[in-house]
C-alpha cells in the first residue's frame, strides 16, 4: 500500500496535464513503514527523452535521479517510488515499464486523455520482476501517516 495526501495526488495529475501530450515523470519521496510507503513530497523531473519519444516513454537521467536522492537525504526522506503519465492511454504499466522498473518501489501511473488526468493507479513489482501488482492508494490528510 502507498499512502499520500490528496495535494500530492493533485500535483501528479497536474504535472501529467501540463506535460501532455508527452509523458511526465518524477520521484515519490517519503518513508518506508513496514510493508507500506508514505509519500511526504513529490519531486517532479523533466522527461529527458527526445521529443517524439516523449509521447510514450520517459527518461530520468542518472544525474537527475542522484539530485533527487540527495534532496531526499537532506530532508531525511527516502525515494519510495516513481510516477509518470500515460498520455491517451490507461493508468497501467506497459511492458517497457516492467522491463525498466525495480522491486520494492511504488510506481504511480496517471492516465491523461486530451490534457485531462482521468485515472491514477499505483503498482508494485513482484520481487522476481515478473509482473506488477496493483497496490492500494490510501488517501491521507496532509501531514499524517497511516495509523
What would you call each of these model-derived segments?
Residues 82:
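Conserved, mostly hydrophobic/aromatic
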Residues 1-79, 87-147:
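Conserved beta-strand-loop surface patch within small alpha/beta domains used
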Amino acid at each position: 500500500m502507498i499512502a499520500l495526501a490528496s495535494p500530492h495526488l493533485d500535483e501528479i495529475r497536474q504535472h501529467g496535464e501540463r506535460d501532455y501530450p508527452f509523458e511526465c515523470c518524477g520521484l515519490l519521496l517519503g518513508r518506508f513503514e513496514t510493508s507500506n510507503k508514505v509519500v511526504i513530497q513529490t519531486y517532479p523531473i523533466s522527461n529527458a527523452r527526445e521529443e517524439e519519444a516523449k509521447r510514450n516513454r520517459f527518461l530520468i537521467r542518472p544525474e537527475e535521479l542522484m539530485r533527487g536522492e540527495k534532496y531526499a537525504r537532506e530532508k531525511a526522506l527516502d525515494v519510495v517510488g516513481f510516477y509518470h503519465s500515460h498520455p491517451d492511454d490507461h493508468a497501467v504499466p506497459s511492458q517497457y515499464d516492467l522491463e525498466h522498473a525495480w522491486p520494492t518501489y511504488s510506481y504511480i501511473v496517471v492516465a491523461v486523455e486530451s490534457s485531462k488526468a482521468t485515472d491514477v493507479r499505483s503498482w508494485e513489482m513482484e520481487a522476481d520482476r515478473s509482473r506488477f501488482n496493483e497496490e492500494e492508494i490510501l488517501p491521507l490528510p496532509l501531514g499524517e501517516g497511516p495509523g
